[in-house]
Amino acid sequence: GLFSRSAIRLLQLMESPLRVRSLTTLGTPWQGSVVGDYTIGDVDLSAAVGDAFLERVLTEFQARAASLPVGAAQQVTGRYLTGDAGWNAFQAGVLDEIPVTLIGGSYFTADGGAAKYWPHDGLVSVASAHAVDVPTAVLPNRTTFTFARTHSIFISDAVGAEWDTAMTWDTEVLDVVADAIAGA
């Protein structure tokens, strides 16, 4: 979702004859993710509210971020994406004529977890996947869906769940994707 908006912007700037009729995102961190925010030090381990799996994800991602290209881990942070000078603001107008379907996963829940980070799909919260605080100037035509699913089969495997618990492997989720494409 994040990179596709940049590609759509370039197509528009180049006056390409190629027209994007719709955009569908699955678990895209429109407003960042707890993983990114933890990696750059904007939140501490308490954001996991004692959830052992999320604590492991946070610490492992932080350790692996050192091997990523410079800035890659920062691109999925609230600090980078939000606010008047954030990446989302730079994308204002790009999606004006494009219907956007936003799909979030709520497989993981926690009592007392901050709404910014909970529920989530193992990496991205429903709030971020639904772009709840992204201004209408950036995202004017949105439809949202939530499924009690993980981000991917990688996350499902990590928690010992069947692959069909992943958004990327669930036929109900994929039906929504197909409908969004067909309706564009």
Predicted regions, residues:
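Hydrolases whose catalytic domains are alpha/beta-hydrolase-1, hotdog thioesterase
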Residues: L2-A7
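Helical cap/lid subdomain of alpha/beta-hydrolase-fold lipid enzymes
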Residues: R9-A184
